[in-house]
Swiss-Prot record:
Tree of life domain: Bacteria
Phylogenetic placement of the source organism: Bacteria, Bacillati, Mycoplasmatota, Mycoplasmoidales, Mycoplasmoidaceae
Residue numbers binding S-adenosyl-L-methionine: 80, 131-132, 148
EC assignment: 2.1.1.-
Family: Belongs to the methyltransferase superfamily. RNA methyltransferase RsmG family.
Keywords, comma-separated and alphabetical: Cytoplasm, Methyltransferase, rRNA processing, S-adenosyl-L-methionine, Transferase
Keyword Hydrolase among UniProt keywords: no
Annotated Pfam families: GidB
GO MF annotations in UniProt: rRNA (guanine-N7-)-methyltransferase activity
GO cellular component, one term: cytosol
PANTHER family in alphabetical order: S-ADENOSYL-L-METHIONINE-DEPENDENT METHYLTRANSFERASES SUPERFAMILY PROTEIN
Subcellular location: Cytoplasm
CDD domains listed in its UniProt record: AdoMet_MTases (cd02440)
Protein's name according to its UniProt entry: Ribosomal RNA small subunit methyltransferase G
């Protein structure tokens, strides 16, 4: 994907984007390429791969969600943010978003600090912790929790749900394996009082994307999330 192609698609998805938005993405791309070897961020560091696999694939799931509007000021936590995907990408488009980036890897947290500073982003918090540890102090705090390629659906829902307020959303982009993963997650979905209210189904980058949108209907029981090693050993 060329720079021109990316900008054309971006404008189609989000008509309010301006030249400053385009320049922020260009700067983001340059920062990834500059620091990739230092922080071991990704194997996809060519221009076309960053435009397509990083930026566009991260944004596409959010283009048709009613509660993501130009001036949204929702509180969102990106769990396992890594190189800022999808949280920082969303922040560039939705400038009033109140963003928290959660990343367990210290080196990648250092990169996220550099990235957000160089992009001049406001209302961004970065936590170098595991999700199950941070939930002890930030339960029921966010409107939205999301992640990308962190874990299977049952696991990511368990470590995410406690962060979200009642009537908030968990947004989980997945591949065509979504249905298989959701079947395995049916017990945790019920236990955590979640309900899938939407399934966004679309093609992007020649891949079939499925995005599950879950509504949190009640407060998450205090015993969740369990320690990560227990989540791995004894899935519900």
């Amino acid at each position: 994907m060329t720079r021109k192609d990316f900008f054309n698609v971006l404008t189609r998805y989000f008509p309010w984007v301006d030249e400053q938005t385009f320049m922020s993405f260009e700067k983001y791309k340059t920062i990834i390429q500059k620091y990739n070897q230092i922080f071991n961020l990704t194997r996809l560091d060519s221009d076309d791969k960053i435009y397509q696999n990083f930026f566009l694939d991260s944004l596409a799931p959010y283009k048709e969600l009613d509660f993501f509007t130009q001036n949204t000021n929702l509180k969102l936590i990106d769990i396992g943010s890594g190189s800022g995907i999808p949280g920082v990408v969303l922040k560039i488009i939705f400038k009033n978003l109140n963003l928290t980036l959660l990343e367990a890897n210290q080196k990648r947290c250092e990169f996220l600090k550099i990235l957000t500073q160089e992009l001049g982003l406001n209302d961004v918090l970065i936590w170098n912790m595991r999700a199950e540890d941070l939930t002890q102090s930030m339960r029921e705090s966010f409107d939205i929790a999301t992640s990308r390629a962190v874990a299977s659906l049952d696991k990511i829902l368990e470590i995410s749900a406690a962060f979200v307020k009642v009537n908030g959303y968990l947004i989980q982009p997945k591949s065509i394996k979504f249905y298989e993963e959701e079947l395995k997650a049916k017990n945790i979905i019920k236990t955590l009082y979640l309900e899938r209210i939407a399934l966004k189904d679309f093609w992007e980058n020649d891949y079939h994307h499925l995005v599950g949108v879950y509504l949190k209907k009640q407060i998450t029981p205090l015993q969740f999330p369990r320690p990560w090693n227990l989540i791995l050993k004894k899935p519900l």
